[in-house]
Regions:
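Acceptor-binding helix/loop patch of EC 2.4 sugar-transfer enzymes
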Residues: 72-83, 129-167
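Donor nucleotide-sugar binding/catalytic pocket of nucleotide-sugar-dependent glycosyltransferases
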Residues: 150-213
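Glycosyltransferase donor-sugar binding loop
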Residues: 229, 239-242, 257-271
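Nucleotide-activated donor-binding/catalytic signature segment of Leloir-type glycosyltransferases, i.e.
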Residues: 270-289
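Aromatic "clamp/platform" in nucleotide-sugar-dependent glycosyltransferases that forms part
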Residues: 307
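A short, well-ordered alpha-helix in the C-terminal region of glycosyltransferases
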Residues: 361, 368-382, 394
Length: 400
């Protein structure tokens, strides 16, 4: 008789008041469905805090809440580089997680690939390992960022180019049986990676819990405001947006355009921007913002110029406020916004001219641009995240 299917769901993130942080949100809703189907062993998260779930769940360790607190306090004084601190947390999670694997488990579903010890123990027990990554394949990101660093003459190491972290990923990922590519950049990059695991295409998005709003018709004014919001590192591609902006502002016909750059900027890329774009006109660097909804509602257009980005939430937030989006073909959120009547323009990466052309078109076609924003909101509002979770649960129940 076949062993009864029992699934453990694993997320590196922690629980929140309503579900989970980051990709733990997907794990939470999937665990809920698997529990209803009688398939769930438990949901393992980094920390539960004071939160409980309507299904079996456990922190990776009874001490995790405390060691995370102590690590963060300690790091305030030691100032460990963020990429080393991240790897330390990942290895600690992996160490404790291996002891959470249950004897009757047949399948592990995880959104975290950095689990070498856990995966090794699972393989020795004949457990099938399924990964649904929230980001594209790490070696692909490494190559993109390394190429860009070379182009910009940047030598600083970060989480994407830290060799020890990449090596840990490579050891771990080769133990995985199946990768579910839910975002186009993830599916494409894992398919091309050359591993033996099967890569399954199952497109879907984690829809944020935006508060319902009543949109008012925004008056078309002379000024046309373009926005960008991110914690800017090299792969966010801000340098290409600024190159596009130089092209645009050299044309006197575009004198009523204004570019608003919001969010913190990593010191390395800031040095590059200060050196190469200090003479730009009609641009404001606002730094971190406290009121993202107000910021989005002040815009006529939003740009996501990322070299690679799994699912930029800012693009979906712009869509929530009916702001049309220019987004690269290496950013997963474009797949959702371009469904039906498209609410975005999808452009190639590293193409300043394409960015400039789309901004200029939007500037000269205001009403059509506003309709694109309404399309974006429609595509977001009518998208069913529940159907996506059900599709994953069906796959785990019947095909995994």
């Amino acid at each position: 008789m076949d062993k009864q299917k029992r699934i453990q769901v694993i997320s590196f993130q922690s629980l929140s008041a309503n579900s989970g942080e980051g990709m733990a949100r997907l794990g939470y809703y999937l665990s809920e469905q698997l529990h209803q189907r009688g398939l769930l062993n438990n949901f393992i998260v980094h920390s539960k805090g004071k939160f409980e779930t309507p299904f079996p769940s456990k922190p990776v360790s009874i001490f995790s809440r405390y060691y995370l607190f102590l690590l963060n306090r300690l790091n305030k004084h030691l100032k460990i580089p963020s990429y080393k601190f991240r790897l330390l947390q990942e290895k600690l999670f992996d160490w404790f997680c291996q002891f959470r694997i249950q004897a009757n488990t047949t399948h592990i579903f995880t959104t975290n690939a950095y689990l070498y010890r856990t995966f090794l123990k699972a393989k020795k027990s004949g457990i099938t390992i399924i990964l649904l990554p929230g980001t594209p394949e790490e070696n692909y990101i490494y190559e993109l960022v390394s190429e860009e660093n070379k182009r910009l003459n940047i030598t600083k190491v970060d989480a994407y180019t830290y060799r020890r972290r990449i090596d840990f990923f490579n050891k771990s990922v080769r133990l995985i049986d199946t990768v579910i590519g839910s975002l186009p950049p993830a599916y494409t990059s894992y398919s091309k990676a050359g591993y033996h695991p099967r890569v399954v295409k199952m497109l879907g998005h984690m829809k944020p819990d935006f508060k319902p709003i009543q949109l008012t018709q925004k008056e078309i004014t002379e000024t046309f405001t373009i926005g960008y919001l991110a914690h800017t590192v090299v792969l966010k591609g801000l340098q290409y947006l600024l190159e596009a902006w130089r092209i645009l502002t050299n044309n006197a016909n575009n004198k009523h355009m204004h570019l608003s750059i919001a969010g913190s900027i990593d010191e390395t890329i800031k040095e590059y921007i200060d050196l190469h774009f200090k003479d730009l006109k009609q641009v404001t660097f606002t730094g971190p913002i406290k009121d993202a909804p107000a910021y989005m509602q002040s815009l006529d257009l939003f740009v996501v110029p990322s070299l690679i980005d799994g699912a930029p939430v800012t693009a979906l937030e712009a869509a929530h406020y009916a702001v049309p989006v220019i987004i690269t073909d290496h950013s997963g959120s474009g797949e959702l916004l371009s469904r039906n009547e498209s609410g975005c323009w999808v452009i190639p990466i590293r193409d300043a001219k394409a960015i400039a052309d789309k901004i200029e078109w939007a500037y000269n076609h205001r009403e059509e641009t506003r309709q694109m924003g309404r399309n974006a909101k429609h595509n977001l509002d009518t998208y069913s995240m529940e159907s996506f979770i059900t599709e994953i649960a069906d796959y785990l129940e019947h095909k995994a």
